[in-house]
Amino acid sequence: MKFFNSFKVFLIILVFICNVQGCFSACCQFDEDIQIRKFFEAQEKALSLGKIDDLKTFYAENYQSNDGFDKKSLFELYGNTVKNHPDIKYKIKIKSLSVQGDYATVQTLSTARATTIEKSPVTGDNADLYISACTIFYLKKNGKNWQIVNEKTLFEKTCLLYGSCKKIGIRLIAPSLVKAGEEYSVTFQIPPKYAKIAMASIKKDVIVYPAQDSKDIYKLLDQEGSLERVFRSNILSKNESVCASLAVAGGVPDFNNLQDLKIEGLGIYLQRVNIMPKSGACNEK
């Protein structure tokens, strides 16, 4: 009888310890979640205030993006963005968060808005900049602080609008992910009523730093206001950026006389295309 009573007491103590450990673990998890949410709130504030030095503390020295950018390259890009768009404001929303010890994975949806500091010599106004992205951040705890060691951008779209392009509803349709060496189509659409007074181009470039910029070849849109191009992705599995440029003329334009053409609107539209390695693909030479 004494044995069973002792065993019963042992079980009660064991269950109590397990419950305490479970509560302690849950509390620790809750604390880490709060820390990471505050981390991204502080990141959003630093981005919106253009505090580059503060922002650097959020990133590990061995940071690397899925585009192959290191910390130095990343902050050169940030610096250029702040220089050309000093009023930029970011919004970051956490979509999912997972913590495993000293490691965390966070998926965010972010948007940014700004105006260019310089006016266009063509349209005479400052451009409106819009950015939207879905990104997975991989964090590691360094002492008491979290730092970003890697990030993978799943989706990213950017547009820069001058003049009448600010009022035109425009769509750039491209896949977010394709296999290396495969064809994919890109479609650029504007409302049909603008089709006769606009020209557009579509090109694609590999995402590298410093950026490579291929030549724009402008073409007339069809009567529905569409322009389409088919590309083949690179076989090096490097991510690509599709760029559509739009020029909207005023009055009744004569596209055979480009020198006298009066441009009232300009637009640049960028969309990321992530390239997935193809099994057994040969390396491009």
What residue ranges belong to the model's regions?
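Surface-exposed, charged secondary-structure patches
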Residues: 79-129, 136, 232-241, 247-249
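Short edge beta-strand/loop segments characteristic of extracellular beta-sandwich folds
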Residues: 183-193
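Short acidic/polar inter-strand loop motif in beta-rich domains
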Residues: 114-116, 158, 247-261
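Short, well-ordered alpha-helical segments enriched in acidic and aromatic residues
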Residues: 46-69
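Short beta-strand edge/turn micro-motifs at domain boundaries
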Residues: 123-167, 270-277
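Short beta-strand elements
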Residues: 251-285
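Short, low-complexity N-terminal intrinsically disordered segments enriched in polar/charged residues
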Residues: 21-49, 57, 126, 159-160, ...
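Short beta-strand segments of immunoglobulin-like
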Residues: 172-179
